[in-house]
């Protein structure tokens, strides 16, 4: 039953009118992990829990109460891309027609996995017409004395149902003499067929080893890819956040930023990106003097600096921990930016979320002086509900070493 708050809550605090005092307490105890959430029709929320080698899909009403009419049985759809094979969810996308696309990976190896996509009908049953798409390994066979690692895939669904699917691989030799990291970009039509004209695009930010973390589309249908490059300097890893822009046909848009690419001036890594209206907004983490900072940037559609955002400079927020992992970025209707993730301090992993104004200033009216350090746990995904403006997170609560409990969190905006 939905709980109701007696007094209004401050922005950034749990919204006690959502679910049970701000939390959807997902059945299954400590045996699952909430990996992704998306807003569905009528403001409902569909979320995916990774539990027992399956993807468990559930739906809640807009206020967080259960929706028993969703799914194949008792409000749940259990899914594996391949029978008796570990299926890990990464991202859930909602189509304009109400259907749902689940992006994830399949395989018995925790590091070398195949990218997989499937589609569900609006009621949560599998879309048998779409079926499932499982991509081959990007390097096959793997050369002797080498290891192949595949990152978690991500995607974007267009209004006409086309899917942009980003993945990649890291190939390295056992003796350390060879390392190659490449991002890959694919496109599928609304029926799930590969766009052969688009093909498979290799993404190498400025020609360097690269990893994709987000993909989105500008209003003119140009494709923006966000991630990180690693330009080794004197034998040392030197990662930095980067963007690439492509035409709708998949060709590099050399009018964007500098010859099609943008990269951070300083050491930075991890992060997420979202296109909002005609702006490219992204977060990353930086380490300055041994302290972890969250970095937030906003660019114009041509890749140039947006001088209306913090005078064109990166917003740097000291989180006073060694390591910061931004996992989600979402933009409210008032153009305020919500960034969330987790921090790590030796033996403690803590959820955080914060808000930056449209002008690029930490919103001190949000949570505690702009930042909420909520509880120990892990955060995977976040969105803003369109009608209510409520902020929603997919997260697990519990200590770094010990039982964690999967949740969907509702936060006052």
Give residue ranges: language-model regions:
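Extracytoplasmic mature domains of secreted or surface-exposed proteins
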Residues: 1-413
């Amino acid at each position: 039953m939905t709980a109701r708050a007696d007094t209004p809550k401050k922005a950034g605090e749990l919204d006690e009118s959502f679910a049970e005092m701000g939390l959807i307490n997902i059945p299954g105890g400590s045996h699952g992990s909430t990996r992704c959430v998306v807003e569905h029709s009528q403001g409902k929320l569909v979320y995916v829990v990774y539990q027992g080698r399956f993807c468990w899909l559930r739906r809640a009403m807009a206020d967080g109460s259960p929706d028993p009419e969703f799914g194949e049985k008792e409000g749940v759809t259990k899914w594996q891309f391949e029978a008796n094979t570990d299926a890990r969810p990464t991202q859930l996308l909602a189509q304009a027609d109400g259907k749902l696309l689940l992006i994830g990976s399949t395989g018995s190896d925790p590091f070398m996995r195949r990218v997989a996509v499937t589609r569900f009908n609006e009621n949560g049953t599998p879309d048998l017409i779409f079926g499932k798409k499982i991509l081959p390994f990007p390097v096959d066979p793997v050369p002797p004395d080498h290891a192949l690692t595949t990152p978690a895939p991500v995607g974007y669904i267009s209004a006409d149902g086309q899917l942009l699917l980003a993945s990649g691989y890291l190939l390295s030799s056992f003796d350390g003499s060879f390392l190659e990291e490449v991002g890959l970009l694919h496109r599928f039509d609304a029926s799930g067929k590969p766009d052969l004209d688009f093909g498979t695009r290799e993404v190498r930010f400025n020609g360097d080893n690269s990893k994709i973390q987000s993909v989105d589309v500008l209003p003119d249908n140009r494709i923006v890819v966000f991630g990180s490059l690693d330009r080794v300097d004197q034998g040392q890893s030197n990662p930095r956040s980067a963007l690439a822009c492509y035409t709708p046909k998949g060709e590099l848009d050399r009018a964007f930023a500098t010859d099609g690419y943008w990269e951070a001036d300083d050491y930075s890594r991890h992060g997420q990106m979202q296109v909002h209206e005609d702006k490219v907004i992204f977060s990353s983490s930086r380490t300055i003097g041994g302290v972890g900072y969250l970095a937030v940037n906003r660019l114009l559609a041509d890749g140039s600096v947006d001088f209306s955002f913090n005078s064109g400079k990166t917003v740097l927020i000291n989180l006073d921990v060694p390591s910061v992992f931004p996992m989600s970025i979402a933009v409210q209707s008032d153009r305020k930016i919500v960034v969330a993730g987790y921090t790590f301090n030796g033996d403690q992993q803590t959820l955080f979320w914060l808000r930056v104004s449209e002008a690029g200033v930490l919103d001190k009216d949000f949570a505690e002086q702009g930042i909420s350090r909520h509880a120990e746990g892990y955060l995977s995904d976040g969105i803003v509900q369109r009608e209510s403006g409520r902020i929603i997170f997919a997260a697990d609560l519990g200590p770094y070493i010990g039982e964690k409990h999967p949740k969907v969190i509702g936060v006052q905006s």
